[in-house]
């Protein structure tokens, strides 16, 4: 081992994974000149064709890292959301989401990180971590000491598998999701609720729409992470009267079916010299549209804490856990409950749900605390203590 090569990043925060959480963390750190480097296992970055919705809480971070305006210009900016049950509109309300594709968000984050002279290493597949020595070993035979490890490597986190004693492997949630980006123009968000399924559609730009169809299926053995499907399979899970509203989906060659996976428990958000962010820390079912926003929040808050307590990683981790754990757990639990709420089968319960949605502010109550959350204020509160 050449010592100079092994030690080249010993003062750096090592970010494992160049996804949304990894790039966001990299930007937050680079803006304050904190040495960091991203290690990505793939030879290049390729985000899949799926939509992502960013509510106010996530937008506050994107504004702070100076990419929100650019994202808005090339994304959807729906102002209203409509809820439909049994092909009839129940209610609608005003929203201020940015709806886009993961690919677009990812490319803007990457561009910003590189603009800040951020360093990223491709083809660096992690195979071992010595958490006491903070030594990373990769499949390309490189071994590198680092200052701290930020695990941003998703639900199938190699970092967690290598280190965590809780061994919480991802488990099938009982839900699967059809996803596609289709050639349809739409200006609003539409939720179609039905027995054992729901569909969400929203614009990702001026000409394309994200289609997400979630359904309940208890056969976990056949549910892979992601498979290429076709229109006939989609039609067996999602009613034709909804699909007929989006005729271009019939000819779409990229219709993917995802098994929705989670963990039975959240597990640790940090251990020794490693901290978990995003899906590596807390995968959630996507039924409140908060997976991406929570990852963005994690990265902003952990990054700001690293900057504030640069020489006290234990304090950084402890405060990160205290700030994040209860919020994430609440949204995680509420997301599962939302699936049940969306997929009611009993006609009486459906009738009651629809009345509640139409004549009360239940949606506002369920979403206000989630969307109004301000990561900047969270950090400011610490500064004022």
Residue ranges with predicted function:
Residues 2-13, 55-164, 168-181, 218-237, ...:
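Conserved N-terminal helical subregion
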Residues 14, 18-31, 39, 150-151, ...:
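Conserved mid-domain beta->alpha element of the FAD-binding
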Residues 180, 189-221, 238:
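Active-site substrate-recognition segment that forms the wall
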Residues 12, 35, 208:
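Residues at the starts of beta-strands that form the adenosine-phosphate
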Residues 333, 337-372:
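Alpha-helical membrane-targeting segments
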Residues 170-175, 187-188, 224, 231-232, ...:
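A short coil-to-beta-strand element that immediately follows conserved catalytic motifs
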Residues 21, 44, 156:
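Conserved Rossmann-like nucleotide-cofactor binding loop
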Residues 30-50:
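Glycine-rich FAD pyrophosphate-binding loop
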């Amino acid at each position: 081992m050449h010592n100079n090569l092994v030690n080249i990043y010993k003062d750096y925060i090592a970010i494992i994974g160049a996804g949304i959480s990894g790039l966001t963390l990299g930007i937050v750190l680079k803006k304050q000149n904190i040495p960091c480097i991203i290690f990505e296992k793939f030879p290049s970055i390729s985000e899949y064709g799926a939509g992502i919705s960013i509510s106010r809480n996530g937008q506050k971070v994107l504004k702070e890292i100076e990419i929100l305006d650019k994202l808005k210009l090339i994304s959807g900016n729906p102002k209203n959301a409509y809820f439909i049950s049994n092909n009839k509109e129940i209610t609608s309300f005003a929203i201020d989401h940015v709806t886009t594709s993961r690919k677009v968000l990812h490319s803007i984050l990457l561009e910003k990180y590189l603009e800040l002279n951020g360093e990223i290493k491709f083809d660096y597949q992690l195979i071992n971590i010595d958490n006491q020595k903070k030594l990373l070993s990769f499949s390309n035979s490189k071994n590198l000491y680092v200052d701290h490890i930020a695990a941003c490597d998703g639900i199938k986190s190699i970092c967690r598998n290598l280190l965590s004693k809780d061994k919480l492997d991802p488990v099938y949630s009982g839900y699967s999701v059809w996803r596609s980006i289709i050639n349809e123009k739409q200006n609003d968000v539409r939720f179609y609720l039905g027995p054992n399924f729901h569909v969400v559609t929203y614009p990702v730009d001026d000409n394309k729409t994200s289609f997400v169809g979630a359904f309940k299926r208890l056969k976990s053995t056949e549910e892979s992470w992601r498979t290429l499907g076709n229109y006939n399979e989609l039609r067996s899970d999602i009613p034709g009267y909804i699909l007929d509203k989006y005729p271009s989906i019939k000819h779409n060659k990229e219709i993917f079916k995802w098994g929705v996976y989670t963990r039975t428990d959240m597990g640790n958000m940090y251990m020794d010299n490693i901290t978990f962010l995003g899906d590596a820390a807390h995968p959630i079912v996507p039924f409140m549209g908060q997976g991406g926003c929570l990852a963005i929040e994690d990265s902003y808050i952990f990054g700001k804490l690293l900057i504030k307590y640069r020489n006290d990683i234990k304090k950084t981790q402890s405060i990160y856990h205290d700030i994040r754990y209860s919020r994430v757990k609440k949204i995680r639990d509420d997301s599962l409950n939302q699936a049940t709420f969306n997929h009611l089968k009993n006609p009486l319960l459906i009738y009651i749900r629809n009345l509640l949605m139409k004549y009360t502010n239940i949606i506002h109550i369920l979403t206000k605390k989630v969307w109004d959350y301000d990561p900047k204020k969270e950090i400011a509160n610490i500064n004022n203590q």
